[in-house]
Amino acid sequence: MRKIIRLLSLLIASVLFAALCSCSKGSEIRLGSGNKGGIYYNYANALSDLDGNITVKQTAGSQANMRLLKDGFIDMGIVQSDVLSEAIKGTGDFKDNKVDNARAVAALYMESFQIIVAADSDIETPADLKGKKVSIGEEHSGVSKNAEYIFNSVSLDIDMIDTCNMTYEKSAEALKNGTIDAFFVVLGAPCDVITQLSQDMDIRILPFDDRTISYMTNLYDGYYETVIKAGTYKGIDEDVKTVGVKAVLVASKKTDSNTVRNFTEMLFEENGEIKKKVELANNDLKFATENIPCGFHKGAANYYSSIGMAVKEED
């Protein structure tokens, strides 16, 4: 009998030890990013360098990340605020595919709409894109939807433009080779792909007039007026008015609360390390938590509460 009790005690101890070891190692966090050359991808990799439990998943961007989050293929993802708004409301491209399991963690930085053309192009405004060959980003990316909205803002139907879907890197190469006339980028400025392109050729960024900015910010949720400062890229010698969206980190409501809390804390406590790889990384708590389309994950809300900030938590 004593032998049986001793064996049971050893078995229980072994199970507890294994459980403790498993907890200390942590669980894998599948983080949806974006395509190479974009800040989502760089940001996600900066986070994975700080936490070995993070596995970066390269995706087509915001729309893909929302669908992957809904279907359980990723635990967290980076998405544009406007795409997040449509997804949780079940509108736009998510009309028949509403996402109800997304919870906010933090807004990471502002993304600016940047329409790039050659410096000697006859294209001066978004309205001049009619009949031109234009890359509007990858399919199922947020930028493709943004492009359609911008066309609408200047009374253009997407059928009036010869659009194609390419990554930012391939778009830059195509502009350099003269096979397209313009391409859309929705990234924080500066971004690597445009910085490199501006070294290889003379470029311009199309400005948005006040009417277009008003149309975009009033009609669509999650859009803000923003400015690309002179000197951001080589050859950009004047401020360029445009619109932007917030890049928001979201988590599935099923993602462990302690994991999300620790992740949220890392965003701010390790901001200096993140900035070494992503200059735009935000450390402003007000920016991170205000005007977010969905409620916050319990774990994120717990962190904000611990530093005296109240956010809207959603079950």
Regions found by a protein language model. Name each.
Residues 71-110, 120, 188-193:
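Acidic, polar ligand-binding/catalytic clefts
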Residues 81-83, 91-93, 121, 158-248:
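Pocket-lining segment of extracytoplasmic ligand-binding domains
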